[in-house]
Amino acid sequence: MTSFKHLALFLLPALLASGCTHASPADNAMACFENSGQDFSKVLSCYKQAAATQPLDYTPTGSTAFPGVEKRSFQLKSQTWTGHGYASPAEWEHTVDIYIPEAALHGKALLIANNGTNVPIADRPISAPTDFTQAMALAVAEQTKTIVISVSNIPNQYLTYSDDGVPRREDDSVAHSWALFVQHPENRPFVSLHVPMMLSLVKAMDLAQAELKPWQIESFIAAGASKRGWAVWLAALADTRVSAIAPFVIDILNTHAALEHTYNAYGKSWPLAFKAYHHEGITRQLGTAEFAQLMQIEDPMLYAKTEAGERLSIPKYIVNASSDDFFLPDNARFYFDELPGEKMLRVAPNASHYGISAFVEHSLVAFTNRLQQQRPLPSLKSVVQPEAGGARLAMNFSEPPTKLVQWRAHNLTDRDFRQPCGIHYEATDISQPEGQDLNVALKTPEQGWSATYVEATMADGLVISTPVQVLPDTYPTWTPKQIEPACKNLLDGA
C-alpha cells in the first residue's frame, strides 16, 4: 500500500497547480478588499471575515475569588497582524479578565477595551492597564450584576516598525500607522492600528461566549476611552453582537470637520496633544484623497450610507471631557444631532482627556443598569436660538431630571478651554422646570470666548448634558498664548 507520505508528495504538485492551497488571513483579507472594488468602507468587514477562519486561541490562567465576584483570567492570542509587513511582534496577545458577580444577569455582558504595555523595551517594562482598573471592574460588576470583561493591551505595544526600527506605543503608533497608510492606501488598507484593535474586541467576544455558556451571553455593551473608544465604535460597526456602546473622550466623529474646526479655533495651529500626528505629517494631509480614504475606514459617520450604517442606531452614551487636551468642547456640533437611534451625551466638567477616568465607573454603572433593566434612555433635545447679546438654549426632557446645573467657562483672550491653559468651569444651579421644557439664556462675553452647557441628573443617577456652546462662534486670527509647557500649540511646517 502506498504510504500517506508518498501519496502526499505525489499529489502536492497537482494541488499547487490547481490553486488548492490555504491562503493566510492577510491574503484572504486583501482578496476581499480587492473583490469589493477597493471599497475602504469594507476594510473592517474584510479583516474580520478573514480572521474568522482562524481557530480561537486562548489559555485559562487562573481564577480569583473576591467578595461577591469571581475573576477568571485568560491569555488570548487575537491575531497575527504585521501592518502589511511593517510592525512586529506580529502575534497580538491580551490578558482577558472576566468578572462574574453573584447572581449575574444572563444574556448581556460589559466589554471593556483596556490599555497596558505587553512588549517591553530597554527602559520601559511591561505595565498593567490603567484605563479601567480591577477596582472599577469589581465595582461595576457588583452594582450592575453584569459580567464585566476587561481586555488589556489594546493595542499591543511597544510595536517596532521596520521602516525605521523605532518602537512605538499609543498615539505614536497610531500616527505612524496612518502615515504608512496615506503613502499607499490601495496597497496597505489594513495598516491603520485601529483595525487590529477592533479585531481584538471581536476575538474577546468569541472567548467570552465560549467561556460563559451558563449565562448565555448573546450581546455586549462595549466601552473604552480615547483610541480604545475609537476601537469600540469600529467594533460596533463590524460586529452585530455589540448592542450598545459607551465611548469616552473620543470626540472626533465627522473627523474632517472636527479637525478643520480645531485648526481654526486655535488660530491655524494644533494642540500639543496632536504632537504625534503633527510629527508624522498627518495634520498636513487633511485635504488629500489619501486622508479621505483613511476616513472611510476610521470615521463612524461616513458609514451612514453603507451596509453598516444601521449599526449607528444602537444605544450610545458618549462621554466627553469639557477641558480635553485633544478635542474642542463643542465638537459634538458636527455629529450628535445627526446620529440615529437612542443616544446620550455627557460632558464631564473640568476634566482633561486623562482625567476622564474619574467619571468612568459612575457612567458605566448608570448606563449598564438602564440597559439591563430595559428602560428607555433619557432624551435631552436642545436647540440654540440666537438673540441679541447671545443666544437662548431651549431644552426638552423625556423624563424629569432631579438636578440641573449650568457649567460655564470664560477665556478672556483665546478660544481655548484646555485644562492646562488655566480654564475652569463654574457651576450654577438651575431651578427645576414645571414641565418638560427649559430655556436658559447664554450671554456672549464682551471679551474673549465662553463655553457653556447644561447638565441634568436623572433619578437613577444617570447624568446627561447638552452639547457645549461656544460664544461668540467666531475664530481668532492668532494662536493661543502659552501659559505653561502643556498649554502649547503646534504650527504646520514648524
Language-model-derived ranges and their functions:
Residues V119-P129, A141, K145-L199, N254, ...:
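Cap/lid segment of the alpha/beta-hydrolase catalytic domain
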Residues P25-H106:
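Catalytic-loop region of hydrolases
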Residues T95, H106-T117:
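Short beta-strand element of the alpha/beta-hydrolase
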Residues G224-L234:
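Glycine-rich nucleophile elbow surrounding the catalytic serine of serine-hydrolase chemistry
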Residues Q183-S226, V242:
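Gly/Ser-rich "nucleophile elbow"/oxyanion-hole loop immediately N-terminal to the catalytic nucleophile
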Residues F367-R408, A427-A441:
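Surface beta-strand/loop "capping" patches
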Residues L234-R284, R346-P349, G355-A358:
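Hydrolase active-site cap/lid region
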Residues A289-P349, F397-L404, T413:
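Serine-hydrolase catalytic core
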